[in-house]
Amino acid sequence: MAQHTVYFPDAFLTQMREAMPSTLSFDDFLAACQRPLRRSIRVNTLKISVADFLQLTAPYGWTLTPIPWCEEGFWIERDDEDALPLGSTAEHLSGLFYIQEASSMLPVAALFADGNSPQRVMDVAAAPGSKTTQIAARMNNEGAILANEFSASRVKVLHANISRCGIRNVALTHFDGRVFGAALPEMFDAILLDAPCSGEGVVRKDPDALKNWSPESNQEIAATQRELIDSAFHALRPGGTLVYSTCTLNREENEAVCLWLKETYPDAVEFLPLGDLFPGADKALTEEGFLHVFPQIYDCEGFFVARLRKTQAIPALPAPKYKVGNFPFIPVKNREAGQICQAAASVGLTWDENLRLWQRDKELWLFPVGIEALIGKVRFSRLGIKLAETHNKGYRWQHEAVIALASPDNVNAFELTPQKAEEWYRGRDVYPQAAPVADDVLVTFQHQPIGLAKRIGSRLKNSYPRELVRDGKLFTGNA
């Protein structure tokens, strides 16, 4: 694999020499940083099993190497990357996999280690969505996830990735993560804080990542991280699990932040060792039981992961002074809900008791039941999935609901050829050789729902959202 030139400040190299365990070679560290990062993907088990995914993609000649800490994760090598970007493959467009760096799969593995099965989870810094979607898959779309993102521009990307992967148990918020300890005290069974950091571990992906690096900025970032972990710890229920992670390598932003929390709440913080998380985890194990992953250990990004348990309650923070405002949705009455369920089922959309129908004007939404306890305590950017808009003739079913709820085994499902599926993703109407009988047609490709079409004569009218329409070369190789 080709080398690339990474910029290293002298002070950074000095700091790394001091931070690196004697069991590791500094020369190996420098050599690893100069190698471009291996591509990796995670199979979305909400839509397809790992075995079926491997069978589906076998004809492509992809080389898939299992990632030790994530059963559904693989390093991937492809001969046709220049001809067809991974993000333009049919399997990516339909949400069968997520392009995710291997080491960033570690925090969620730690969160669910030792049979942990939380019902309400918060992802404090969630965009672009790799870990939120991984959490949702581990929860099998059950329970509830609060996915927060401080950056307004990244909330849209977060929602797009959640929708593509067919996730239905998520509420999105847009706040500084430091508000949650006061706003939602002891509300979560598990919390992932993948903290904003100096990014020292990402030089293999971005050779200029350290251009603005300084020891002073590390100190400033660590101060923010302490405030974030303190807030997250207050939002965690007693007995709950907190995973703290970064993609940086200095101790100030990693071990020191966790040790500060333990010093602050000595009777409430228990470190849970990660040495048995996967075979070979001991190579990155610190004396505290954390994983400090230097890039040469597993040939991945530099990363840090700590897992801890809240053993008892701690004094509450002052209640927030802001007003949430009136919640604009009302629950749908049982009788009407039954009619909506019946109409949805006729086009292949079904859901279970983990979701409940709510209405706002002519909009119908499905919210995860597990998030209802948070209503009135925090303002949501987006909650659950938009099911439909009502109109005089019935319901206008929404694309995100089709991707999250549709069963490809529905009698009205219509499987497209590769050429017709590509037309669909380009936003064009489809003219199949033999038109289906039903007026509302669940469109599938590779036995996966990719949208809902209206049959008009021999034409299937495209309803693919304009913002998702793709140009350029797609999976059939035609531009």
Swiss-Prot record:
Residues bound to S-adenosyl-L-methionine: 125-131, 149, 176, 194
Enzyme Commission code(s) on record: 2.1.1.178
Protein localization: Cytoplasm
Gene Ontology molecular function, alphabetical: RNA binding; rRNA (cytosine-C5-)-methyltransferase activity
Reactions listed under catalytic activity: cytidine(1407) in 16S rRNA + S-adenosyl-L-methionine = 5-methylcytidine(1407) in 16S rRNA + S-adenosyl-L-homocysteine + H(+)
GO biological process: rRNA base methylation
Active site: 247
Keyword entries, A-Z: Cytoplasm, Methyltransferase, RNA-binding, rRNA processing, S-adenosyl-L-methionine, Transferase
UniProt xrefs under Gene3D superfamilies: 3.10.450.720, Vaccinia Virus protein VP39
Predominant location category: cytoplasm
GO cellular component terms, A-Z: cytoplasm
Enzyme class: transferase
Top-level taxon: Bacteria
Similarity remark: Belongs to the class I-like SAM-binding methyltransferase superfamily. RsmB/NOP family.
Family annotation (PANTHER family): 28S RRNA (CYTOSINE(4447)-C(5))-METHYLTRANSFERASE-RELATED, NOP2 YEAST -RELATED NOL1/NOP2/FMU SUN DOMAIN-CONTAINING
HAMAP family to which the protein is assigned, alphabetical: 16SrRNA_methyltr_F
Protein's job: Specifically methylates the cytosine at position 1407 (m5C1407) of 16S rRNA.
Protein name stated in the entry: Ribosomal RNA small subunit methyltransferase F
Organism, scientific name: Escherichia fergusonii (strain ATCC 35469 / DSM 13698 / CCUG 18766 / IAM 14443 / JCM 21226 / LMG 7866 / NBRC 102419 / NCTC 12128 / CDC 0568-73)
